[in-house]
């Protein structure tokens, strides 16, 4: 019976669940400063067999626990670097604000590198804390820069000028200096001029050397050459005819007369050939004179303006002159007519020669007899 009880007791002990437990006193004894060491997970292994099964590797650890351990180590390293960076900035605060180095810029670049690995709120809070510190330092540097640029002590500058010019406020009262001799003031401004000219590039003034007399403008000499030439021309009889008086009222209006003459030639052609319009270029072009051609164009423009004829383009897109009946003439004289158009004709000497050759114009339609 004793043997059976012992065997049952052994079996009961094997069937019980055994736990590997770490006492709380031993856990509390771990140093809190060892923050840089990787976090260790205390796992309670539930064993149903003997203790030899633990060493055989049958109890596997979850890979997620290993990943969490690695992430915790990375985050702890980032926090440590952030704290170290803020500590260095606090220690060098005076040098960063008062000097012109790039310490603040380098610290911001280092913080940007650390921020690339931030994935949790705790590290992001440290980054925000560092940014607040950096912004305060930047504000202090900006205030110091503005104060240095805008600072100008007017009184100190005036004292420096007086000392440089040989005057000193400490030698007497300001009222005494206001009544100083003109020679002292002149010497002061001469000293200022001498110093200022050394900083300015300026050419020396040019002075003429005329001797001891005072320069006076010379009297203008009368021009006798022109009078001599006029006398010679009068003696030789080469003087042009002088125009005593121009009386325009004694001459008839040449433009109106020429327009009426050309209108008569045009109406004669229309009566002879009522159904055949005349070519504009053949009518106005004078193959022997470019100036006469320009005058003919000028006179024909009055005929078209008054509505005695009109200009249009034929099938070849060339200008032609054709007569107008009584109704069309009334419409042409009406200033409110919407069909009236104005144009500008330009004609060069080369274009005149080309037109004469192209149209084979050998004789002018507008004769010269009445000129």
UniProtKB/Swiss-Prot annotation:
Biological role: Tissue-specific component of the SMC5-SMC6 complex, a complex involved in repair of DNA double-strand breaks by homologous recombination. The complex may promote sister chromatid homologous recombination by recruiting the SMC1-SMC3 cohesin complex to double-strand breaks. The complex is required for telomere maintenance via recombination and mediates sumoylation of shelterin complex (telosome) components.
GO cellular component, one term: Smc5-Smc6 complex
Signal peptide: none
GO biological process: DNA recombination; DNA repair
Family under the similarity heading: Belongs to the NSE4 family.
Transmembrane domains' residue ranges: none
Keywords tagged on the record: Chromosome, Cytoplasm, DNA damage, DNA recombination, DNA repair, Nucleus, Repressor, Telomere, Transcription, Transcription regulation
Keyword match Nucleus: yes
Subunit structure: Component of the SMC5-SMC6 complex which consists at least of SMC5, SMC6, NSMCE2, NSMCE1, NSMCE4A or EID3 and NSMCE3. NSMCE1, NSMCE4A or EID3 and NSMCE3 probably form a subcomplex that bridges the head domains of the SMC5:SMC6 heterodimer. Homodimer, and heterodimer with EID2. Interacts with the C-terminal region of CREBBP.
Protein localization: Nucleus; Cytoplasm; Chromosome, Telomere
Disulfide bonds: none
Pfam families: Nse4-Nse3_bdg, Nse4_C
Protein name as it appears in the record: EP300-interacting inhibitor of differentiation 3
Stretches of the chain forming a coiled coil according to its record: none
Keyword Oxidoreductase recorded: no
Source domain of life: Eukaryota
Organism the protein comes from: Macaca fascicularis (Crab-eating macaque)
């Amino acid at each position: 019976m004793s043997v059976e009880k012992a065997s049952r007791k052994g079996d009961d002990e094997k069937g019980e669940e055994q736990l590997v437990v770490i006492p709380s006193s031993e856990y509390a004894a771990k140093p809190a400063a060892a923050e840089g060491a990787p976090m260790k997970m205390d796992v309670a292994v539930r064993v149903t067999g003997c203790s030899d099964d633990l060493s055989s590797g049958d109890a596997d650890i979850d890979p997620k626990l290993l990943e969490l351990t690695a992430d915790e180590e990375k985050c702890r390293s980032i926090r440590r670097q952030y704290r170290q960076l803020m500590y260095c900035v606090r220690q060098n605060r005076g040098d960063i604000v008062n000097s012109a180095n790039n310490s603040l810029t380098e610290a911001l670049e280092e913080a940007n590198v650390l921020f690339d690995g931030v994935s949790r709120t705790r590290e992001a809070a440290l980054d925000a804390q560092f940014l607040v510190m950096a912004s305060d330092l930047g504000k202090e540097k900006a205030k110091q820069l503005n104060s240095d640029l805008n600072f100008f002590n007017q009184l100190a500058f005036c004292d420096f000028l007086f000392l440089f010019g040989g005057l000193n406020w400490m030698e007497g009262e300001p009222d005494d200096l206001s009544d100083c001799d003109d020679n002292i003031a002149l010497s002061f401004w001469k000293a200022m001029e001498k110093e200022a000219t050394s900083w300015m590039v300026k050419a020396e003034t040019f002075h003429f050397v005329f001797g001891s007399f005072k320069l006076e403008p010379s009297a203008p000499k009368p021009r006798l050459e022109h009078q001599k030439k006029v006398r010679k021309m009068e003696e030789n009889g080469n003087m042009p005819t002088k125009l005593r008086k121009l009386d325009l009222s004694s001459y008839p209006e040449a433009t109106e007369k020429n327009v009426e003459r050309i209108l008569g030639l045009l109406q004669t052609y229309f009566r002879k050939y009522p159904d055949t319009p005349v070519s504009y270029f053949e009518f106005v072009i004078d193959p022997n004179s470019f100036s006469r051609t320009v005058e003919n164009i000028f006179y024909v423009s009055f005929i078209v303006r008054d509505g005695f004829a009109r200009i249009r383009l034929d099938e070849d897109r060339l200008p032609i002159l054709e007569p107008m009946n009584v109704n069309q003439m009334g419409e042409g004289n009406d200033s409110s007519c919407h069909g009236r158009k104005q144009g500008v004709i330009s004609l060069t000497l080369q274009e005149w020669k080309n037109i004469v050759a192209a149209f084979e114009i050998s004789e002018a339609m507008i004769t010269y007899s009445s000129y």
